[in-house]
């Protein structure tokens, strides 16, 4: 069921974002008087189509992992004399550049719109209050203390942990990052400076703030079982809701330690407390439908006190402003991470492919529509930036060729473009295969 949910959420997200991107190209082409043959969502066999009064075929194709806009172009077909003025290649460099850049621009506009809707509706979140500081960490060296709330980072307001994570990630390598804090529920401000010159982190394994040693206030996990899955190893071993899992010394077993034992995939013994009595049980993990080891239990969570919770909700104009700011932060973060990948400061193992995106889509959709919309905004920004990358098969590569044409006064030769396209396609395919390989390693 979780696989189908993730797959369905992924298809919806990709279909919407590809439609937005391709509509940007389509809209700009129409504005420039270019004839559009086909607007397709997906590749492969056409499963639905409709032709409008301008002769454009709108189609939905079998493979929902992309899309395209096919325009009248003298480089690819014989153009009738009466239609030459409607061909893409007959337009000025400026007009063609506008058509190319309109796709990524549409993705950024979608992200702004999505965050505008999110902030209008209201997004529940947790205040950025620090629960603890890891000893000898960068945060500890900066004398940041527990039970303080992060107010700003280099002057930018921080109302939630997601914003903090993004801002800190963009500060990687900077020697002086100013953080403003205050003791929780106090008006006294404190200033601290982080030295991030030699700091790097793995975004697949931890958040930026946790890598710095900042542990957020979050719901407490109690080793009292709140759920036992039917026909699971836990139920077969006789575990029940309300059972307390203990260490050998009869103290509570931390949930993370319990998970580590499960992930080893071997039988292990636990002590269980029930109705004042203590006894031993043996659990034998099995693999679930996602290939991960599990025993079929969930712990109870102590609800986070209301004083630590808030809702990000604003008026119409302020929501728009926040949407623009958030999209800008995401764009800067994406560019920084791309830069770190190119310089080797971040491992290419952090690249994610469609499987990771599908899992993220399913998880966010499972939490709620607001979170799914936020996830789509994030992917839309990434899609916009990646398409502007100067690789010949991408929009950015087309813009490079058009820039060279504007400088030289004539188009780049078909032969050079063809060679560049082949190299670009090979590089893009290699990155896609590598990202897929990373996805499989994470399963």
UniProtKB/Swiss-Prot annotation:
The keyword Cell inner membrane applies. The chain crosses the membrane at residues 98-118, 369-389, 423-443. Keywords: Cell inner membrane, Cell membrane, Hydrolase, Membrane, Metal-binding, Metalloprotease, Protease, Repeat, Transmembrane, Transmembrane helix, Zinc. Residues 106-185, 198-287 form the PDZ domain. It comes from the Bacteria. PROSITE patterns: ZINC_PROTEASE (PS00142). Zn(2+) binds at residues 21, 25. Belongs to the peptidase M50B family. This is Regulator of sigma E protease. It comes from Haemophilus influenzae (strain ATCC 51907 / DSM 11121 / KW20 / Rd).
């Amino acid at each position: 069921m979780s696989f189908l949910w993730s797959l369905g959420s992924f298809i919806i997200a990709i279909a919407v974002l590809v439609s937005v991107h391709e509509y940007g190209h389509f809209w700009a082409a129409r504005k420039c008087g270019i004839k559009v043959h086909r607007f397709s969502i997906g590749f492969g066999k056409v499963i639905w189509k409709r032709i409008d009064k301008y002769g454009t075929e709108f189609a939905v194709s079998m493979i929902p992992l992309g899309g395209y806009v096919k325009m009248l172009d003298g480089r690819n077909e014989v153009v009738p004399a009466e239609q030459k003025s409607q061909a893409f290649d007959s337009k000025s460099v400026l007009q063609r550049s506008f058509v190319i850049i309109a796709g990524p621009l549409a993705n950024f506009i979608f992200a702004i719109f999505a965050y505008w809707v999110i902030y209008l509706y209201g997004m529940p979140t947790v205040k950025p209050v620090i629960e603890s500081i890891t000893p000898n960490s960068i945060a500890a060296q900066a004398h940041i203390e527990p039970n303080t709330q992060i107010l700003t980072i280099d002057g930018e307001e921080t109302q939630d942990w997601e914003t903090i994570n993004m801002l800190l990630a963009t500060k990687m390598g900077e020697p002086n990052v100013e953080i403003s804090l205050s003791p929780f529920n106090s008006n006294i401000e404190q200033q601290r400076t982080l030295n991030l010159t030699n700091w790097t982190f793995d975004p697949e394994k931890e958040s930026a703030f946790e890598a710095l040693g900042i542990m957020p206030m979050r719901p407490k996990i109690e080793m009292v079982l709140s759920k036992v899955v039917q026909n699971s190893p836990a139920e077969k071993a006789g575990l029940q809701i309300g059972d307390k899992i203990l260490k050998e010394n009869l103290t509570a077993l931390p949930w993370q330690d319990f998970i580590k034992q499960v992930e080893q995939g071997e039988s292990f013994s636990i002590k269980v407390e029930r109705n004042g009595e203590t006894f031993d049980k043996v659990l034998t993990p099995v693999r679930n439908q996602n290939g991960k080891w599990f025993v079929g239990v969930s712990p109870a969570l102590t609800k986070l006190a209301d004083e630590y919770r808030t809702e990000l909700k604003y008026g119409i104009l302020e929501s728009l402003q926040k949407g623009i700011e958030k999209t800008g932060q995401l764009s800067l973060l994406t560019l920084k991470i791309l830069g770190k990948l190119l310089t080797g400061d971040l491992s290419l193992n952090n690249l994610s492919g469609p499987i990771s995106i599908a899992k993220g889509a399913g998880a966010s959709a499972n939490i709620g529509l607001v979170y799914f919309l936020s996830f789509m905004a994030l992917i839309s920004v990434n899609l916009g930036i990646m398409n502007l990358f100067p690789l010949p098969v991408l929009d950015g590569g087309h813009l490079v060729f058009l820039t060279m044409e504007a400088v030289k006064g004539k188009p780049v030769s078909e032969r050079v473009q063809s060679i560049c396209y082949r190299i670009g396609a090979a590089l893009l395919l290699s990155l896609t295969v590598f990202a897929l390989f990373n996805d499989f390693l994470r399963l």
